[in-house]
Amino acid sequence: MKTLMRHGLAVCLVLTTMCTSLLLVYSSLGSQKERPPQQQQQQQQQQQQAATATGSTQLVESSPQPRRTAPAGPRQLEGYLGVADHKPLKMHCKDCALVTSSGHLLRSQQGPHIDQTECVIRMNDAPTRGYGLDVGNRTSLRVIAHSSIQRILRNRHDLLNVSQGTVFIFWGPSSYMRRDGKGQAYNNLQLLSQVLPRLKAFMITRHRMLQFDELFKQETGKDRKISNTWLSTGWFTMTIALELCDRIDVYGMVPPDFCRDPKHPSVPYHYYEPSGPDECTMYLSHERGRKGSHHRFITEKRVFKNWARTFNIHFFQPDWKPESPAVNHAEGKPVF
């Protein structure tokens, strides 16, 4: 009898517990149904925010730091075609050293500074061997006039060193650069590319040459042909450098009024021809020449001085800066 009573009490206890649990569950469900829709929506938003915050924390802790983007590749320069494949030149430098051929570089000891620059630009057949302490030893780009090609060929073992990966840009009038077999300079370049297939040789197109003429007219107000002017290799080199470089450090270029000073020092026109003509004598004779064609060195330097007021151009050996302009110049590099 006692055993039956204990068994009955146990069953009642179990039933009571189950009923209580069911009532609690029913009450919870009922309370959710009775909540206004706004409260239900707020609860869902709180749950989503909590989940998002948790996920964000995990994402920050597990994700790597963002990587730096790779620098932009070399930009394509229009108007400069490969002699062998006729493909356009692709090149870009943040910092450039434009090394002139001036006698002002003698005993300057600027060579180490020049060689530390990302890209070093030289002109024509200006050598480095024997002058490294003053002009440096590296060459990234060499701009060469058609009249200097023969001298380049004679000194090809020194000047056409393909181990440095130097880029060579040749310029000349269309009669010398024509491709129909009658262009003397172009024929020499074709032969050169066959002898040195690894040479990075480029030529300025005829259309680009006309644009260089137009740029000279825009900057000076003078028509090149009417004024019997031959653009110098320095004109081509400075303009190419503006296309190629973000910053240009020019070594050996005097300001345009340098030769007007009667006390100016006498230096050779070329640092590698110490017994050659005086620099200012050469500049003044070409600037004043009227018969025949001449380089207008001083006129070109006035343009370079104006460009330096706006663009990232700096002059060393001698060191000088252009005075502040009286009027604001339009931003943007010279365009063709």
From Swiss-Prot:
Keywords: Disulfide bond, Glycoprotein, Glycosyltransferase, Golgi apparatus, Lipid metabolism, Membrane, Sialic acid, Signal-anchor, Transferase, Transmembrane, Transmembrane helix
Top-level enzyme category: transferase
Pathway(s): Glycolipid biosynthesis
Membrane topology reported for the UniProt record: Single-pass type II membrane protein
Highest taxon, organism lineage: Eukaryota
InterPro entries with a match to the protein in the record: Glyco_trans_29 (IPR001675), GT29-like_sf (IPR038578), Sialyl_trans (IPR012163)
Alphabetical GO biological process terms: glycosphingolipid biosynthetic process; oligosaccharide biosynthetic process; protein glycosylation
Biased composition (Polar residues): 50-66
Side of membrane Cytoplasmic, spans: 1-8
Record bears the keyword Membrane: yes
Residue ranges that the UniProt entry lists as topological domain Lumenal: 30-336
Gene Ontology CC terms: Golgi membrane
Entry's transmembrane regions: 9-29
Reactions it catalyzes: a ganglioside GM1b (d18:1(4E)) + CMP-N-acetyl-beta-neuraminate = a ganglioside GD1alpha (d18:1(4E)) + CMP + H(+); N-acetyl-alpha-neuraminosyl-(2->3)-beta-D-galactosyl-(1->3)-N-acetyl-beta-D-glucosaminyl-(1->3)-beta-D-galactosyl-(1->4)-beta-D-glucosyl-(1<->1')-N-acyl-sphing-4-enine + CMP-N-acetyl-beta-neuraminate = N-acetyl-alpha-neuraminosyl-(2->3)-beta-D-galactosyl-(1->3)-[N-acetyl-alpha-neuraminosyl-(2->6)]-N-acetyl-beta-D-glucosaminyl-(1->3)-beta-D-galactosyl-(1->4)-beta-D-glucosyl-(1<->1')-N-acyl-sphing-4-enine + CMP + H(+)
Residues glycosylated per entry: N137, N161
EC number: 2.4.99.-
Expressing tissues: High expression in forebrain and to a lesser extent in cerebellum. No expression in salivary gland, intestine, liver, kidney, heart, lung, thymus and spleen.
Disordered as annotated region, ranges: 34-76
Ranges of Low complexity composition bias in the record: 38-49
Location(s) in or outside the cell: Golgi apparatus membrane
Family indicated by similarity: Belongs to the glycosyltransferase 29 family.
Matches recorded under PANTHER family: ALPHA-N-ACETYL-NEURAMINYL-2,3-BETA-GALACTOSYL-1, 3-N-ACETYL-GALACTOSAMINIDE ALPHA-2,6-SIALYLTRANSFERASE-LIKE, ALPHA-N-ACETYLGALACTOSAMINIDE ALPHA-2,6-SIALYLTRANSFERASE 5
Described function: Predominantly catalyzes the biosynthesis of ganglioside GD1alpha from GM1b in the brain, by transferring the sialyl group (N-acetyl-alpha-neuraminyl or NeuAc) from CMP-NeuAc to the GalNAc residue on the NeuAc-alpha-2,3-Gal-beta-1,3-GalNAc sequence of GM1b. GD1alpha is a critical molecule in the communication and interaction between neuronal cells and their supportive cells, particularly in brain tissues, and functions as an adhesion molecule in the process of metastasis.
Listed name of the protein: Alpha-N-acetylgalactosaminide alpha-2,6-sialyltransferase 5
